[in-house]
């Protein structure tokens, strides 16, 4: 389903396609008209995608077709072996993880996983993990620490599942445990925010030495809709909330919440997922190279300093 701000672009694309079909069917030379429209389309695309509002970027971050964790694992990694279950209650499909190779190096990978359609989203709980998902992630953190493998995570969740069943099984406590466990890793840890980075559900697997974010992804303590419902008593004020939350990649880089922005193809990662995944792989390799050679103690201290330096402080 097209986004509202993309409709003028889609209309021009439709008109160009119609002219090409007409020229092919009738033999009439419409090359000049087509070229003019294509030039106009290029300008419109550039103007639109270079001046996106925070709310428009949130919409792009949620677009169907963006690369998921499993997409990245399939195309950027080799020999991925998925591990299931938390060895306590169940397996949570909203979080996937396991062992893989990245350019010949053994790594442990964990990430949120959304579905492509309604059926798969129901199975994956729309990427909202239960406590057993975070326990599975911690199991993999321990595995990475034990064998000295780099620990890589991919974030794409509106937040941890807030249902009664999750609360009964200790959702808040498990998120806190996961944050603590990841902060104590003695191996290189790198996080990539693929789409949505919603609150503690995202942070639970994002306490890394390097945090990267895709150009149109977002990362915040709360979703714009929820923030608007609380502050303005109306979820329709989400665009205003998105502006106030400073949740875009550019804002987060300025605030030093993230360390680098991974560029997306024009129009968003869903327009050319393969190219987006190549960019992700390149950014991951660069981040790992920066951490290469650091001792376990130095990696721990690097991560500690990174998170202690976040925020703004005013002396009384």
From Swiss-Prot:
InterPro entries: Acetyl_CoA_COase_a_su, ClpP/crotonase-like_dom_sf, COA_CT_C. It is found in: Cytoplasm. One of its GO terms (biological process) is fatty acid biosynthetic process. GO terms for molecular function: acetyl-CoA carboxylase activity; ATP binding; carboxyl- or carbamoyltransferase activity. PROSITE patterns: COA_CT_CTER. The keyword Coiled coil does not apply. Acetyl-CoA carboxylase is a heterohexamer composed of biotin carboxyl carrier protein (AccB), biotin carboxylase (AccC) and two subunits each of ACCase subunit alpha (AccA) and ACCase subunit beta (AccD). This is Acetyl-coenzyme A carboxylase carboxyl transferase subunit alpha. It comes from Thermus thermophilus (strain ATCC 27634 / DSM 579 / HB8).
